[in-house]
Amino acid sequence: MGSNLSPQLCLMPFILGLLSGGVTTTPWPLAQPQESCSLEGVEIKGGSFRLLQEGQALEYVCPSGFYPYPVQTRTCRSTGSWSTLKTQVQKTVRKAECRAIHCPRPHDFENGEYWPRSPYYNVSDEISFHCYDGYTLRGSANRTCQVNGRWSGQTAICDNGAGYCSNPGIPIGTRKVGSQYRLEDSVTYHCSRGLTLRGSQRRTCQEGGSWSGTEPSCQDSFMYDTPQEVAEAFLSSLTETIEGVDAEDGHGPGEQQKRKIVLDPSGSMNIYLVLDGSDSIGASNFTGAKKCLVNLIEKVASYGVKPRYGLVTYATHPKIWVKVSDPDSSNADWVTKQLNEINYEDHKLKSGTNTKKALQAVYSMMSWPDDIPPEGWNRTRHVIILMTDGLHNMGGDPITVIDEIRDLLYIGKDRKNPREDYLDVYVFGVGPLVNQVNINALASKKDNEQHVFKVKDMENLEDVFYQMIDESQSLSLCGMVWEHRKGTDYHKQPWQAKISVIRPSKGHESCMGAVVSEYFVLTAAHCFTVDDKEHSIKVSVGGEKRDLEIEVVLFHPNYNINGKKAAGIPEFYDYDVALIKLKNKLKYGQTIRPICLPCTEGTTRALRLPPTTTCQQQKEELLPAQDIKALFVSEEEKKLTRKEVYIKNGDKKGSCERDAQYAPGYDKVKDISEVVTPRFLCTGGVSPYADPNTCRGDSGGPLIVHKRSRFIQVGVISWGVVDVCKNQKRQKQVPAHARDFHINLFQVLPWLKEKLQDEDLGFL
């Protein structure tokens, strides 16, 4: 009955820009009706194959550490036969086989030696580099052959500093022509036959001592970027030091500063999302990419920034779904709604691949009416994410649009102030059919940065963007979770605390709580008695086995479970809240993070409300007078699961509260308001849906509203009408009057504000 409410998060906020370069890309032939191909004889020795594009292509799959030889993919030709198995030197092979992956040897290494020397290197082999006297080593002195056929670390370079520019090096597997590094000197790189060059083939020594373009590498068809490689390279590119920052930014030409992408809420950035919806992409990849973009928008918004969005899908023709000039283009919820409504079938009737027209659609959004630039145009960063396989088959070379864009934005015209940091593109190719030449041509090329990535499948793309999220600056943000499919229970509920109170000769009490700050856990007061000692209270967070030391338990002063015994009410749970103060400060991480509390600045940001938002306005947003979807976290079979419930805060509120009379000991209460005070929220019952109920061990845990990808606690689980978890098993069939009651945090805010005043929560 538990519900995983948060969508899979694929993407993090990152800067994406338009394309740069001038390389002619390779078109993909238009699809023609063709015969189906027989699968007889297509097997691969030591591996398997899977069909792609409804049987019109196949991919060979080998175990880890092996690659398909001589090709990774084959296509079904119009003659009804599969494409021939040919090696890199065009020799025909009769049968495909899985061969062990090797890493290439250095073709050349200048001004030094490497050891050991070998024609090739096996996975896990190491190689060491040493420089001659008078030369200094840059990069990695020791490198290891990895399972994907690439070397670990960075290119080793021996340099004596004699050139105007430093030696650009020879990446392993490439060949370099040119050994002079004076101003405006150039070097060129080449790959062996059958390998594809990624990065810049030609690099020129520029003013300031930097090289144009980006470091090249030689790629085999079976090579993919691992999620970790992509994440590290991407994050590195965002913070790379650059020169020639726009003087209007307060930095003179040649002055260095960190390349930081600033998502300014005032709207100094336009993010264009361009998604290939052609036949070669396929419906499943299109849907997966769309989900990733939805989560990108959500993630950017969760950090409190509001760039303007443009949204384009394309096949034979582009479709502009959102323009940056639309009034709501900076409204993340509205843009997400438009994206969710896009279907792969929207391009079904004309399903070619016209990347050039898609970029022209972006250009049209960037250009100005009557060619008159608006004020501040030169301070706006234009950004894009392009998800494609690079197989354009109509419309011409998309690179030709780039010159127009660069001219429009005055990019690269002033050598002292090239404004290159206002124009970037990161191209993500997904799957085995990606055209590496084309996606490389479409990506920006900047020194010490990587902008083009090839990942194995959509699942790997998810991994990429999870790993891109730099948690270090956001761990203290409340109500955020790591919703990765590989995440543990505490990645998905990082605020959840387990509480145990040991009472000699009386057994123990189990409860839940929520981390609300680095020193405090919020829970229910009834979990403790006045006789409990701090050393008998055990608290654990983040799934850790160690218990945290307790300094003190703070009860709400109005809590008194025996307060109405004289009136025949055996237990009275009004103000059933307590704060556990820890002796030592919690160290936030992916599995330990605070939940949001009402009427705090953090919740205002989480809900994307104006800074002037009042506590009452937060209450109206979180607890409107209606049925409110919420959740609590329960432990079942040692696993934390989310249970979706509805807070009855509208016309069902009265009937929900009246069912309290069915609770043991309350059957003789004449006025139910004697036990259900205004401090309670009510869940449970069968309308509008059959709500799951809490169990005894859930007491003290948070009642949560999940909104805009953030989790805000609105209540503390207190008591229930029916024990639905007898014999440690949750009953599936429960009576309609099975209700649960929770302390409404809006009703105990003065106490929370007083006790948490030193926790920097910014109470309103």
Swiss-Prot record:
State the EC number(s): 3.4.21.47
InterPro entries per the UniProt record, alphabetical = Compl_C2_B, Peptidase_S1_PA, Peptidase_S1A, Sushi/SCR/CCP_sf, Sushi_SCR_CCP_dom, Trypsin_dom, TRYPSIN_HIS, TRYPSIN_SER
Q: Does the keyword Magnesium apply?
A: yes
Where does the record place the site Cleavage? 259-260
* SS bond partners: 37-76, 62-98, 103-145, 131-158, 165-205, 191-218, 478-596, 511-527, 599-615, 656-682, 695-725
Query: How does it get modified post-translation?
Result: Cleaved by CFD following activation of the alternative complement system, generating Ba and Bb chains. Cleavage and activation takes place when CFB is already associated with complement C3b.
Q: Which GO terms describe its molecular function?
A: serine-type endopeptidase activity
Subcellular location per the Swiss-Prot or TrEMBL entry: Secreted
Q: Where does Mg(2+) bind?
A: 278, 280, 353
- Name all VWFA domain ranges: 270-469
| Signal peptide range in chain numbering | 1-25
Active site (catalytic residues): 526, 576, 699
Is Repeat given among the entry's keywords? yes
GO BP terms in the entry: complement activation; complement activation, alternative pathway; proteolysis; response to bacterium
Q: Where is the Peptidase S1 domain?
A: 477-757
Cite the Sushi domain residue spans from the record.
Answer: 35-100, 101-160, 163-220
Gene Ontology cellular component annotations, sorted alphabetically: extracellular region
Where is carbohydrate linked to this protein? 122, 142, 285, 378
- SMART domains reported in the protein's UniProt record: CCP, Tryp_SPc, VWA
The entry's keywords: Cleavage on pair of basic residues, Complement alternate pathway, Disulfide bond, Glycoprotein, Hydrolase, Immunity, Innate immunity, Magnesium, Metal-binding, Protease, Repeat, Secreted, Serine protease, Signal, Sushi, Zymogen
State the function annotated in the UniProt record: Precursor of the catalytic component of the C3 and C5 convertase complexes of the alternative pathway of the complement system, a cascade of proteins that leads to phagocytosis and breakdown of pathogens and signaling that strengthens the adaptive immune system. The alternative complement pathway acts as an amplification loop that enhances other complement pathways (classical, lectin and GZMK) by promoting formation of additional C3 and C5 convertases. CFB is cleaved and activated by CFD to generate Ba and Bb chains; Bb chain constituting the catalytic component of the C3 and C5 convertases.
Task: Please give the PANTHER family that the UniProt record associates with this protein.
Answer: COMPLEMENT FACTOR B (PTHR46393:SF1), SUSHI DOMAIN-CONTAINING PROTEIN (PTHR46393)
Instruction: State the similarity comment.
Output: Belongs to the peptidase S1 family.
This protein's assembly is summarised as: Monomer. Interacts with complement C3b; this interaction is dependent on the presence of Mg(2+).
Q: Know anything about its domains from the record?
A: The unliganded VWA domain has an inactive 'locked' conformation whereby the scissile Arg-259|Lys-260 bond is protected from proteolytic activation.
What is the name listed in the Swiss-Prot or TrEMBL entry for this protein?
A: Complement factor B
Record the organism.
Answer: Pan troglodytes (Chimpanzee)
Question: What's the encoding gene here?
Answer: CFB
